[in-house]
């Protein structure tokens, strides 16, 4: 009897944590764009990039946090721009559901060292299965291709 009560209490406590706490939709390291690889509707960045570190987390309530460090070009054909963000002055995070952009953040600055952090809330459809988070470039004032993502195509 005591074992059954203990098991019931443990299950109730776990259910309470799952319902009352913030549930994670996705928590992942990020990988840099290798060059010509679109992810769903988001085109590739056009050049190879590298990333010292990156992580993204999306919670069920839409809370989104993305942080990258050392996101810079990794393409010798870019000459002196290699190892820099080369004109990419900002990034926006997009949440893809089934390959389509379901939500996108405002642009935040990308430092000359390739560092950026986004903390915001987005509205993602409740039926979004296996979301992918991509970090998109702002170059010459326009949002373009992806530079880093939580999964590769």
Feature-to-residue mapping (PLM):
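Transition segment at domain starts
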Residues: 20-62
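C-terminal motif of bacterial Sec signal peptides marking the signal peptidase cleavage site
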Residues: 15-16
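Conserved aromatic beta-strand anchor motif in extracellular beta-sandwich/beta-rich domains
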Residues: 93-97
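Short, well-ordered beta-strand segments enriched in hydrophobic/aromatic residues
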Residues: 64-72
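Helix-rich interaction surfaces within compact, conserved domain-sized segments
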Residues: 100-153
């Amino acid at each position: 009897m005591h074992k059954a009560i203990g098991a019931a209490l443990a299950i109730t406590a776990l259910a309470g944590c799952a319902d009352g706490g913030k549930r994670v939709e996705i928590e992942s390291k990020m990988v840099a764009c290798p060059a010509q690889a679109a992810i769903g509707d988001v085109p590739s960045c056009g050049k190879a990039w590298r990333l010292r570190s990156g992580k993204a987390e999306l919670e069920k309530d839409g809370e989104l946090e993305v942080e990258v460090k050392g996101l810079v070009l990794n393409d010798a054909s870019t000459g002196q721009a290699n190892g820099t963000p080369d004109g990419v002055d900002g990034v926006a995070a997009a949440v893809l559901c089934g390959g389509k952009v379901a939500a996108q953040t405002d642009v935040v600055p990308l430092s000359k060292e390739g560092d950026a952090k986004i903390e915001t809330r987005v509205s993602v459809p409740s039926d979004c299965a296996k979301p992918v988070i991509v970090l998109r470039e702002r170059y010459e004032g326009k949002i373009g291709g992806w530079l880093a993502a939580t999964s590769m195509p």
